[in-house]
Amino acid sequence: MKKSSILLMALTFIGLGAESATACTGITLISGDGACVVARTIVWGGSDLRSQYVIVPRGYRQQSLVPGGTDGMVFTAQYGYVGLAVEQQEFVAEGLNEAGLSAGLFYFPNYGRYEDYDPARKSSSVADLQLVPLVLSTCRDVGEVEELIGRIRVINIDPRASTVHWRFADCSGRQVVLEFIDGKPIFYENKLGVLTNSPGFDWQLTNLNNYVNLYAGSAPDHDMGGVRLAAFGAGSGMLGIPGDVTPPSRFVRAAFYQTTAPQQAEAEATVLQSFQILNNFDIPVGVEFAAGKVPADIPSATQWTSATDITNRRIYYRTMHDSAIRCFDLATIDFTKVKYRALPLDEVRQQPIVRMKVR
């Protein structure tokens, strides 16, 4: 990969503005048989991300980019993993390793700040867009992620580019959010299991208190001044839930949709449920841009949606080109023998349509 590629990606995000890059939504569901499923959208309306899946075997060596070069931290995969990457195969946005650790990045513009890059410490410096591969390669659980972050320096290749924050979850059920504030890493326990973008995670949790009046179901009829008041339809207990696509509003909706969803008995049914919930967070091309200013001819700003069954080591995805759900079962992959590969998420970038025949 060329250094110019990451700079082009960063400058693209800068030129189009943070609003078009920051609409990813993550949720968490637990099945009746105890499987933990983390799911998310990846949204970018400014261009086609040319997303790929990567299969990374044990022993695979990678090196991070740093400002002005490609000679940052070197790391070798102790654990094999499957990742879903954007723009370049090195930029894994979501992935799962064979130990049962899930990792994903979400854009976090205008609020985070990494430590300043020190060339004397480049051997322990990793680009933010390459932290997910590092974590999946070298950590087996959230505790090891915390230890790793204490030993390394996460940096921006270009200081003009947006920062990101991360979601890490393991098969014990523990999930954390990592944010860098004023150059310092901060971990938050994510018991709710929801994540979007800016502002910070702690603010998003506090903001939920503004919606303490919301509840599942319908508000009861009642009299007011001799007038009988009745709901127009079902679901009036959620009247007032924010409906726009900004990160705070999506966080609130995701929290309520996730926590009110009926628990499914088994893991795969829970995976399918997560895709259904995330249908509500698909963002059509155009809503994030002024009229006549849409920069890309793509079918959706939601370029792909993934669901990871951490317990059973499976990662599922569908794309803006093909809504059929595809699955990698890590239990069927021999990471001591498989070769590294990076291939497009879609073999054919077209939605199949079944033509019904009436006889």
Predicted segment positions?
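Bacterial N-terminal signal peptides
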Residues: 8-17
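Aromatic/basic-lined ligand-recognition segments
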Residues: 180-184, 189-192, 200-201
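A contiguous strand-loop segment
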Residues: 23-120, 160, 359
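Structural recognition of the beta-strand scaffold that forms the well-ordered cores
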Residues: 37-39, 102-105, 167-169, 177, ...
